[in-house]
Amino acid sequence: MAPPLSPGSRVLIALIRVYQRLISPLLGPHCRFTPTCSSYGIEALRRFGVIKGSWLTVKRVLKCHPLHPGGDDPVPPGPFDTREH
């Protein structure tokens, strides 16, 4: 079971959700990765908290450009993940 979300994580997840609902539909599907960068960000914040989750999200977004091939890039397992990957 993952720890409860910090207020900072909740705020960042809410901002990502606003992007997903209001901005992303206007831009159309263009993410090179699976899961999308915004879904990755939400999952990273849930698994790792605001500091490490934000760092992982920023690194992911910086890789999202035409020179990177993209593909499957899941969030790494968190400290509370019990599933085998």
Swiss-Prot record:
Consequence of gene loss (knockout): Cells lacking this gene are viable with no apparent phenotype, but they are affected in the insertion and processing of three YidC-dependent inner membrane proteins.
GO terms for biological process, alphabetical: protein insertion into membrane
Swiss-Prot/TrEMBL keywords: Cell inner membrane, Cell membrane, Membrane
UniProt keyword Cytoplasm present: no
GO CC, one annotated term: plasma membrane
Record carries keyword Membrane: yes
GO molecular function, one term: membrane insertase activity
Signal peptide coordinates: none
Pfam families, alphabetized: YidD (PF01809)
Taxonomy, superkingdom: Bacteria
Topology with respect to the bilayer: Peripheral membrane protein
Subcellular localization: Cell inner membrane
Main location: membrane
Entries under PANTHER family matching the protein: MEMBRANE PROTEIN INSERTION EFFICIENCY FACTOR-RELATED
Entry's family note: Belongs to the UPF0161 family.
Purpose: Could be involved in insertion of integral membrane proteins into the membrane.
Protein name: Putative membrane protein insertion efficiency factor
